[in-house]
Each structure stands twice: as structure tokens, then as C-alpha cells.
């Protein structure tokens, strides 16, 4: 997805430090950032925020973190948080490679990866969010019962991710090869998921855990 540059977005985000972390000011202090101490769930690459804001509204007993590096998109998540009055959702504007700078070991209960960039060229494999270096970060910050939820329309990325996770020592608790045909009604659509689904694209989904989180 090509993101149109918004020169004003950085200043707009900086005007809301209570909701947006742009400079690592809350690194290592995620729990203290929220009004209540509750389980923490993260979505990495939140896009415009439809998925994460819907989750936060439905589950006030869980604290959510939206992690998105594109400032020109993050402002849309911020607008939704403000409009919906969500107190259990915060935003980190940074790259996922910095995860362990923000979260303590075992601090997170769930990670969502929705429609991540597939980086189809082999030479770019290390940029995929299911590459082993990212899996190592997830393992570090997830608690013993924590899990990873992954969703994509890209069959190649899904196959790669299944293999990458298996080789890393993860196991799968759920695999859907055609999510919308098998959906039990609990699925929350992202903006892109609706677009892909309307075009007839198949949606793939999995839930996975580490055999040993530490």
C-alpha cells in the first residue's frame, strides 16, 4: 500500500502524548501507561485502526496497543480512539523491530498480525513479520499462555509463515484456509480484509503458540 505523505501528521500526533508514543517515552512502562492493570494485546501494523478499535470497544477488560510506523496512517487510528472515547487503547508509532524496547519479557498476552506486507521477493524475506528474528521478539515479550493470531489474503505469505513458525518451534491451535467460509461470526474485519473479501479473495488465518515462551 502506498501511503500519501501528510506533513502535518507528526505534529498532530505529538499533541496527544497521553495516547501516542512517538519517542519511546513509555518504553518499558506499558502497564503504567494505562488507567487499569489488565492483560495487554498488541496489533502490529494496525493500518487505519478498524480492527484494533473494534476489539478495544468490545473488550474493556483488556488493554490494547496499536503499533504502526507510518505517521500518515497513525493519525486515523488516533482519530478513532478519540471519537470512540477508548481508554484501553494506546498507540506506538514505531517499527516492530523495537518491540523489546517497549515491552518487558512476558508482559504481553496476545499479538495480532493482520494483512502484513508479504515482501514477496526472497531477498526481502527478513522484513516479513513472521521471519525468525521477529518470532524471537514475540517469544520474548509473550507470557507463558500468550499466542499469536495471523491473518492474510496472501497464500504465499501464509505458507511461508506456517513453515517459519514450525521451524522456530511453534505449534498451531487453529488454522483456517478459507476464513469467511468457516467463520463462526466472531471475526472482526480489517479495512483491507473487507476490500479483499469483496473481490472474492480467500482469507487465511491461524493461531499459534510457542512450545516454550522463554
UniProtKB/Swiss-Prot annotation:
Ligand binding (substrate): 121, 153, 190-193
One example GO MF annotation: tRNA (guanine(46)-N7)-methyltransferase activity
Enzyme class: transferase
Metabolic or biological pathway, per its Swiss-Prot or TrEMBL entry: tRNA modification; N(7)-methylguanine-tRNA biosynthesis
Active site per database record: 117
Residues binding S-adenosyl-L-methionine: 43, 68, 95, 117
GO cellular component: tRNA methyltransferase complex
CDD domains the record matches: AdoMet_MTases (cd02440)
Record-linked InterPro entries: SAM-dependent_MTases_sf (IPR029063), tRNA_(Gua-N-7)_MeTrfase_Trmb (IPR003358), tRNA_methyltr_TrmB_bact (IPR055361)
Taxonomic superkingdom: Bacteria
Keywords, alphabetical: Methyltransferase, S-adenosyl-L-methionine, Transferase, tRNA processing
Catalytic activity: guanosine(46) in tRNA + S-adenosyl-L-methionine = N(7)-methylguanosine(46) in tRNA + S-adenosyl-L-homocysteine
Entry EC number(s): 2.1.1.33
Function: Catalyzes the formation of N(7)-methylguanine at position 46 (m7G46) in tRNA.
Stored NCBIfam families: PRK00121.2-2, tRNA (guanosine(46)-N7)-methyltransferase TrmB
Family to which the UniProt record says this protein belongs: Belongs to the class I-like SAM-binding methyltransferase superfamily. TrmB family.
Protein name: tRNA (guanine-N(7)-)-methyltransferase
Amino acid at each position: 500500500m502506498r501511503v500519501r505523505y501528510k506533513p502535518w501528521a507528526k505534529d498532530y500526533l505529538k499533541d496527544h502524548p497521553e495516547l501516542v508514543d512517538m519517542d519511546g517515552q513509555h518504553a518499558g512502562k506499558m502497564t503504567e501507561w494505562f488507567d487499569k492493570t489488565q492483560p495487554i494485546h498488541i496489533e502490529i501494523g494496525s493500518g487505519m485502526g478498524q480492527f484494533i478499535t473494534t476489539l478495544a470497544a468490545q473488550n474493556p477488560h483488556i488493554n490494547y496497543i496499536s503499533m504502526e510506523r507510518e505517521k500518515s496512517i497513525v493519525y486515523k487510528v488516533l482519530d478513532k480512539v478519540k471519537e470512540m472515547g477508548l481508554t484501553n487503547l494506546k498507540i506506538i508509532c514505531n517499527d516492530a523491530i523495537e518491540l523489546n524496547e517497549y515491552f518487558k519479557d512476558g508482559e504481553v498476552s496476545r499479538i495480532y498480525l493482520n494483512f502484513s506486507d508479504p515482501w514477496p521477493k526472497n531477498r526481502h524475506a527478513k522484513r516479513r513479520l513472521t521471519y525468525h528474528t521477529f518470532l524471537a521478539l514475540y517469544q520474548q515479550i509473550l507470557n507463558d499462555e500468550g499466542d499469536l493470531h495471523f491473518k492474510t489474503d496472501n497464500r504465499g505469505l501464509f505458507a511461508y509463515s506456517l513453515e517459519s513458525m514450525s521451524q522456530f518451534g511453534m505449534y498451531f491451535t487453529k488454522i483456517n484456509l478459507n476464513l469467511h467460509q468457516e467463520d463462526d461470526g466472531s471475526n472482526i474485519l480489517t479495512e483491507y480484509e473487507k476490500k479483499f473479501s469483496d473481490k472474492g479473495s480467500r482469507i487465511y488465518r491461524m493461531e499459534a503458540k510457542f512450545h516454550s515462551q522463554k
